[in-house]
A protein has these predicted regions:
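Mid-chain, well-packed structural core segment of small domains
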Residues: 58-84
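Short acidic active-site motifs
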Residues: 11, 47-48, 90-91
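Conserved small/polar residues in nucleotide/adenosyl-binding loops
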Residues: 98-99
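Well-formed, non-transmembrane alpha-helical positions, independent of function
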Residues: 51, 71-72, 94
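Compact, glycine-rich, soluble single-domain proteins
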Residues: 34-55
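Internal alpha/beta domain cores that form substrate/cofactor-binding pockets in large enzymes
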Residues: 11, 35-41, 71-80
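Short, acidic/turn-prone active-site loops that include or flank metal/cofactor-
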Residues: 43, 84-90
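N-terminal first-folded block
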Residues: 3-39
């Protein structure tokens, strides 16, 4: 499983459509394995769902996200946890604990 987080300086970036980076976490046996930072190369909103799908992402954790982007993620089969704030690493750890 792969979890992506909208990312800026260790924190969850608060606007999905404007994020310039995702931190992607490879999850193995319910634990965080390898992580990497991916630049979005200027892609925004709906294009980001395709970008994440191409990277094999199953789940997205982010701050604010509009209805169009939510629909694009749903169509791509990516589970969404929106409205999240705080440290990216902690959010992923919490997600693993409570799912």
């Amino acid at each position: 499983m792969k979890i992506a987080v909208t990312y800026e300086n260790g924190q969850i970036f608060q606007h999905f459509g404007h994020t310039q980076q995702f931190k992607v976490y490879q999850i193995n046996d319910g634990k965080i394995g390898e992580t990497k930072i991916l630049g979005t190369d200027g892609n925004g909103h709906g294009a980001l769902a395709g970008f994440l799908k191409a990277e094999g992402v199953d789940t997205l954790i982010c701050g604010g996200i509009g209805a169009g982007a939510q629909s694009a993620l749903k169509e791509a089969g990516i589970k969404l946890y929106g409205g999240v704030t705080g440290e990216a690493d902690k959010a992923v750890e919490d997600c693993l604990l409570y799912t």
